Structure formats: C-alpha cells, structure tokens
A protein has these predicted regions:
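Short sequence/structural segments immediately N-terminal
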Residues: 2-183
Length: 183
C-alpha cells in the first residue's frame, strides 16, 4: 500500500473518530437539565423535575440524568437521534419566536406524546412481566397486566396514562401544572 493511501486512511479514521466524539459529547450535553433550563420556557419543568422522585428526591437518591432519558424514544439509536434533532430544532425555533411556542399548560394532558414508554421501560423493566415482579404490590401487578393486555389489543394507553402528576403528585414534575397556571 502506498504511503499516501495509508496516510489518507489514517487521517480519515482520525477525523471520523473526532467527529464521532464531538457528536457524542453534543448529544450528551444537550440532553442535560442544565442545558434545557437555559431556555426560559423549560425552567419550570427543570425546577419541578429536581423535586421529583425521578430527579433524585427519593430514598435512594437516584436521579435520571438527562431530560432526554424520558422525553425521547429509546427503541433505536437512529430513532432517538432523529427525534432529538427534530425536537431540538422545534424548541430552538420556538424559543427565538420563529414558530409558535408549545403551550405546555394547554398540552399538559397530552404527555403521552412526549414521555415515551420505551424510556420508562429502560429502568422499570420489571413491569414487562408483572406476574414475576415480586416487589410489586398485588394491585400494581394487576394494573400492569391490564396495561399489557390493552397494549396488545392496540389501545391508546401509555405509562403516563396512569403514572402522572395528577394521580401521583410526587412523580416526574411535581406541581408543574400549578406552576404553569401561575405564568
């Protein structure tokens, strides 16, 4: 192999790795609550998240680290990246007034469109087989069996159909709806 060809291959590999690294860092940084809170419209969401079970306000002190852990689909890397690009672009355009901002107060109960079951199931995988989840109460096992039965029938049901701030005030964004009403 000629030195020029070998040099071009090595340079291409180094450039490719560099681009991959920068992309991975940007994907990580732009999913963190601090980044999301840099936009005025997301501040109430980030504040309420930090007071939630998922934000670390739990006996274990465990916290979900990125807004995108819950608010982007997790079925495939490509689907995740495409959704992140679309969502981020829409958020940025709305923040700068180029498109209409999402009315979070008006769309609060449409959360099934921006909280993904695939994200919930990454951590709460035991609900996939509720009959085997001995740590769950009997009523919780029953409810999750119902969820899976309905899902198989094609019902429009999601984790947040039941798990939301109204039914579980300590959930992901406690007091968010009240805070949005104040604005």
């Amino acid at each position: 192999m000629k030195k020029a060809t070998l040099g071009a291959l090595i340079a291409g590999a180094v450039i490719g790795l560099g681009i991959s690294y920068v992309t991975a860092v940007l994907v990580d940084v732009t999913g963190k609550p601090e980044f999301c809170a840099s936009c005025h419209t997301m501040k109430p969401m980030v504040e309420s998240f930090h007071n939630s079970v998922h934000g670390g306000n739990n006996p274990q002190g465990f916290a979900v680290h990125h807004c995108t852990d819950c608010h982007l689909p997790k079925k495939s890397l490509m689907g995740y990246l495409v959704a992140k690009g679309i969502s981020g672009t829409q958020d940025a355009l709305a923040e700068f007034g180029l498109i209409k901002k999402v009315d979070f107060k008006e769309n609060y109960w449409e959360m099934k469109h921006y909280v993904y079951d695939s994200a919930c199931l990454q951590c709460h995988h035991m609900v996939k087989e509720p009959e085997k989840a001995l740590s769950m109460s009997e009523s919780s096992r029953f409810a999750h069996k119902y969820y899976w039965t309905q899902k198989k029938k094609g019902a429009d049901i999601s984790c947040v159909s039941c798990h939301n701030d109204y039914t579980m005030p300590h959930f992901a964004h406690p007091g968010l709806l009240d805070k949005l009403r104040e604005e």
